[in-house]
Amino acid sequence: MTAYTLADLAALVASRAGTDPATSYTAKLLSEGPAKAAKKLGEEAVEAAIAAVQGDKTGLRNEAADVLYHLVVLLWAGGVELDAVMAELERRTAQSGIAEKAARRPA
């Protein structure tokens, strides 16, 4: 198992955020605004879902990596820190999913 973490990925995105969009895909995505990052995340998520349904494990692995990368880019673009997302996941795992969903306020 690799030691590479989502925190490592977030640090990489942060380090490339202010670089030249002509030489960094991350900087290019960020320079085009959150809508572009959101669109790419959606595309990659659909591709991951298709790979899963087709039983394509290699495709699913590769598309899942793309989903995680584009999610971290979108979080950066939206000003949301990965630590905040992880804290929310930790909070949610402290109770059952059914109890957590029941405790949500109606939209």
Swiss-Prot record:
Q: Which reaction does it catalyse?
A: 1-(5-phospho-beta-D-ribosyl)-ATP + H2O = 1-(5-phospho-beta-D-ribosyl)-5'-AMP + diphosphate + H(+)
- What keywords is this UniProt entry annotated with? Amino-acid biosynthesis, ATP-binding, Cytoplasm, Histidine biosynthesis, Hydrolase, Nucleotide-binding
**Quick one: which pathway?**
Amino-acid biosynthesis; L-histidine biosynthesis; L-histidine from 5-phospho-alpha-D-ribose 1-diphosphate: step 2/9
What parts of the sequence cross the membrane?
A: none
| GO annotation, biological process | L-histidine biosynthetic process
Give a Pfam family name: PRA-PH
Q: Which SUPFAM superfamilies match?
A: all-alpha NTP pyrophosphatases
UniProt GO MF annotations: ATP binding; phosphoribosyl-ATP diphosphatase activity
What are its E.C. numbers? 3.6.1.31
Location(s) in or outside the cell: Cytoplasm
Q: Which GO terms describe its cellular component?
A: cytoplasm
**PANTHER family in the record:** HISTIDINE BIOSYNTHESIS BIFUNCTIONAL PROTEIN, HISTIDINE BIOSYNTHESIS BIFUNCTIONAL PROTEIN HIS7
Entry's family note: Belongs to the PRA-PH family.
- State the protein's name: Phosphoribosyl-ATP pyrophosphatase
Q: List the source organism.
A: Methylobacterium radiotolerans (strain ATCC 27329 / DSM 1819 / JCM 2831 / NBRC 15690 / NCIMB 10815 / 0-1)
